[in-house]
Design a protein with these regions (language model features):
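Membrane-interface amphipathic segments in extracytoplasmic regions
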Residues: 1-196
């Protein structure tokens, strides 16, 4: 989690949900610890005096983005199960083959930082404000109004690689598999829990 300067605003950064754009909008640099939720200071941020917010993303788009990001970071594969599997099993050419690799071991995929289901952050971070990545250009104004002195404007640009040497189009079967893996995310995404 990341406190927005000296305010009572705390950003719960779900990987691959425009988190770098959010912290940058408030003049902050992204830190690797922004994704953490188990440090003492993170537990302190769960207090009622803090206003916690997060950005939720369409689960299919997030999955493909996480795969692309994993491909771009293969040189940093040690200790990262998804990147190690990509290298060890030749899964760098097709997102569908990558997904099929985890058919019998979904937990191995879902414990990887960039593939952890969004519901984990939603349930454990207890946000009071949920923004949607697909509407972030307008939704961010909710947070900007709470800390106008720090808001520098949102620059929505994808930091993940747009061009990768792999097929990143999911088949219908793969889309169904993603929907099964992230069924709770889809319930939150499509249900009233996140608003419209």
């Amino acid at each position: 989690m990341r406190q927005i300067h000296d305010t009572k605003l705390v950003f719960i950064h779900i990987p691959k949900t425009a988190g770098m754009a959010v912290v940058s909008a408030f003049g902050l640099e992204h830190l690797p610890t922004d994704h953490m939720m188990s440090r003492d200071q993170d537990r302190a941020f769960l207090g009622s005096e803090y206003v916690r917010f997060l950005v939720f993303r369409d689960p299919v788009s997030r999955f493909v983005s996480a795969y692309k990001y994993s491909l771009s970071m293969l040189e940093h594969h040690h200790g990262n199960s998804a990147r190690e599997d990509i290298l060890n099993h030749g899964l760098d050419k097709d997102v569908n083959a990558f997904l099929a690799h985890y058919a019998d071991q979904p937990a191995r995929l879902l414990k990887n930082l960039h593939f952890v289901p969004q519901w984990f952050y939603y349930v454990n971070g207890k946000p009071s404000i949920i923004l949607r990545q697909e509407h972030l250009a307008t939704d961010i104004q909710i947070i900007a109004n709470l800390a106008p002195q720090y808001f520098e404007g949102l620059s929505v640009q994808n930091k993940s690689p747009s061009q990768v040497e792999a097929n990143t189009s999911l088949t219908d079967e793969s889309k169904a598999r993603v929907k099964d893996l992230y069924r709770t995310d889809f319930m939150l995404w499509g249900g009233s829990a996140l608003g419209s």
